[in-house]
Amino acid sequence: ALNAPVLQEAKAYERHIDIKWIPQSKEDIKYYRIYRSFDGVTYQPVAIRRPWMNRYTDFLGEVGKKAYYKVTAVDYALNESNDSQTVSATTYPMTDEQLLDMVQEANFRYYWEGAEPNSGLARENIPGRNDMIATGASGFGIMAIVAGIERGFITREEGVQRFLKITSFLEKADKFHGAVSHFIDGTTGKTVAFFGPKDNGGDLVETSFLFQGLLTARQYFDQENDKEKQIRRSIDSLWKNVEWSWYKQFKDSPYLYWHWSPDQAWVINHKLIGW
């Protein structure tokens, strides 16, 4: 039998409520079913969530509206677990500052909770491709995690553990004269030529976005303990090994070039100009 989900919180904003539960083993779960009540007595199903999801956002469209929630797990034979415990929250008028906090925390959660689990980096949001990471977006996510630590959304130690995972993965991932590809398989570290066979090597734009985030993290983790020293050493090694001058293609070129392929060289031949 499936265990009842454990609800962690219901958090209200001006016109919607977020609920969150502890994820369970996914093998036997087809989906989670969310129930809502406005009186705490009569509940109606309002949504389902796939087993890899552990949040639901309920848009009520009103200020001052209280709602109660329960969640169940449903298996592939459509057997349903017992109800979770009940959580409730009430929407309220938000200040501009509270609105900005809400947006910032949601942005952080996208990268923190939605990361590819083996690498800790940002997934490319393509249906059916749960293990493909986007390196440029990962740079944005790295900055979001640093902000999340500073804002208290997670602890510094939680952030440190994530960055040890990220840097360890990147050290082993495919690189092309130090640069990374646009897409990487999060389970193997191998390049994914998603845009076609010519796009199977270094991508200097995505590399730049990634390293902007990494260098931000390198400066942020400045404590003199073994873990933060390791993060700094790893990031130093990664960025110092990027051969930016290689991507000029020609010695006297005034331009950098976007792509380089290990078997087709400069076949795309795209100059980085006009920016």
Question: Which positions does each model-derived feature cover?
Answer:
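Low-complexity, Ser/Thr/Pro/Gly-enriched N-terminal "stalk/linker" regions
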Residues: Y92-I133, H177-A179, F183-I184
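Membrane helical hairpin/interfacial module
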Residues: D131-G139, M143-N200
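Pro/Thr/Ser/Gly-rich low-complexity, intrinsically disordered linker/stalk tracts
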Residues: A1-D28, V63, D75-M94
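Extended ligand-binding clefts on enzyme/binding-domain cores
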Residues: E97-M102, H177-S208, Q223-W275
